[in-house]
Amino acid sequence: MSHPTIAHGPMTNPNDFRPGVYRHYKGNHYLALGLAREDETEELVVVYVRLYERAGVPMSTRRLKVWNEIVTDANGTTQPRFVFVGHQT
């Protein structure tokens, strides 16, 4: 399994973050609930829930700077790791 190439850029302003449904570059959808602060590092993390069936705990966190990364997939396509799809209704 190959891992994506990551282009590191400036961290997105936390005020620009929008809760809602996001599509991961591999195709799955997630509901981003909001931002939280990691207690030990004080880094901002996105709190989200996967919107597909899979064993295990459905809620996760991901560092905001990783959430906003630009990745290059195995086919050489460069794209955001997550793309905002819209608000959950």
Positions of predicted regions on the chain:
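Mixed-charge, low-complexity intrinsically disordered regions
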Residues: S2-T89
